[in-house]
Amino acid sequence: MVLQNDIDLLHPPPELEKRKHKLKRLVQSPNSFFMDVKCQGCFNITTVFSHSQTVVVCGNCQTVLCQPTGGKARLQEGCSFRKK
C-alpha cells in the first residue's frame, strides 16, 4: 500500500528541509550567514551579518544599509546583496 504522503527520508525535498529546525535537518546547517551589501549611493561594499542586531551604516556616506528586526536584518530599499 502506497500513500500519497510518503516521502523519501534519505532524499527529502529542499523546500521541506529549509523549513525544519536547524538541528533537525538531515545535514545540520545554520540559518545565518554573512553577506556583502552594496550601498545604493556610493556603491561601497560592506560585509554584514544576516541576523545583525544593530543598525549597519555605510563607511563612506553614512547611509543606513540594514535595520534589525526580531530575526533577520531588513535591508533598505535599493541595496543589493550576495551571500558569502
Swiss-Prot record:
**GO cellular component: a single term:** cytosolic ribosome
Q: Which domain of life is it from?
A: Eukaryota
User: Could you tell me which Gene3D superfamilies the record lists for this protein?
Assistant: Zn-binding ribosomal proteins
**Record Pfam families:** Ribosomal_S27e (PF01667)
Which GO biological-process labels does this protein carry? translation
The UniProt note on the cofactor reads as follows:
Binds 1 zinc ion per subunit.
What InterPro entries would the database entry show? Ribosomal_eS27, Ribosomal_eS27_Zn-bd_dom_sf, Ribosomal_zn-bd
Induction per UniProt is: Down-regulated by UV-C treatment.
Any idea which GO molecular function terms this record carries?
mRNA binding; structural constituent of ribosome; zinc ion binding
Keywords from UniProt, A to Z, are: Metal-binding, Ribonucleoprotein, Ribosomal protein, Zinc, Zinc-finger
Q: Which family does it belong to?
A: Belongs to the eukaryotic ribosomal protein eS27 family.
Q: Where are the zinc fingers (C4-type)?
A: 39-61
Q: What name does UniProt use for this protein?
A: Small ribosomal subunit protein eS27w
Give the SUPFAM superfamilies listed for this entry: Zn-binding ribosomal proteins (SSF57829)
Q: Do the record's keywords include Metal-binding? A: yes
**Entry-linked HAMAP family:** Ribosomal_eS27 (MF_00371)
Name the cofactor(s) required for activity, per the record: Zn(2+)
